Regions:
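P-loop/Walker A NTP-binding region and its immediately flanking N-terminal helices
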Residues: 1-170, 174-180, 187-197, 205-214
Length: 217
């Protein structure tokens, strides 16, 4: 299934990279990922304070979907290396002092949560189950795998798998759309299936290769 995208006009001018230019901002714009999209669409229709883990291969779209417009939350992005047992209180204080629009949720996004130490996970878990964070907080942790996460941490969160299985054809379709939108000549169209396969279903890597092809055309 190809993404429902509206592309800006271009002619081989790349003031920003293709991966940035075509980064999806709405749930419907993501390539593949039908199950995560359905889950997030339901959540966006009636959001509530909760904790989630988005897990799957690097580059599949976990962080971008967490920031989708439909979620309607004020995002606060925390790299996992800053989320350790020693500074959990500092993270909590920052969340309380962030500017918040009335009625909006606060999104605390922790990337690469599987890199957190067990002590950091349990320290954060103790705060998730208390009133430490603002009551309107949504936590989304991204991870390449669940293997490095504590069982107690997993039991407190809802896991959503971002599987790249079967995405190769969808990525190839996206690349063809972008090639045409960027003014690539039909007779010079590269093998999009090959690019998709070589990227191992990493959309960002596929777009980097496509950008190289466009510059060489």
């Amino acid at each position: 299934m190809e993404a429902n995208l509206s592309f800006p006009q271009s002619a081989f001018n790349f003031p920003v990279s293709l991966s940035e230019k075509y980064r999806p901002h709405r749930i419907v714009e993501f390539v593949g990922l039908e199950k995560p999209k359905k889950i997030l669409e339901r959540f966006a229709a009636s959001p509530y304070p909760s904790a989630w883990i988005f897990y799957g291969n690097s580059g599949v779209g976990k962080t971008s979907m967490a920031l989708a417009e439909e979620i309607g939350a004020e995002p606060h992005h925390i790299p996992s290396q800053k989320c350790n047992a020693a500074n959990i209180e500092e993270v909590i204080r920052m969340c309380h002092y962030l500017p918040m629009a009335p009625g909006r949720l606060l999104l605390v996004l922790v990337d690469e949560a599987d890199a957190m130490t067990p002590a950091a996970q349990l320290a954060l878990l103790s705060k998730l189950d208390s009133t430490a964070f603002p009551p309107s907080t949504v936590f989304i942790f991204t991870a390449n795998s669940l293997d490095g996460l504590e069982c107690r941490f997993l039991s407190r969160t809802r896991q959503v798998e971002f599987s790249s299985y079967g995405m190769a054809s969808a990525i190839a379709g996206l690349l063809r759309q972008i090639w045409q939108s960027e003014g690539g000549k039909a007779e010079e169209t590269p093998d999009m299936e090959r690019i998709s396969k070589n990227s191992r279903n990493n959309v960002g890597d596929a777009l980097m290769t496509l950008e190289t092809e466009l510059r060489a055309a």
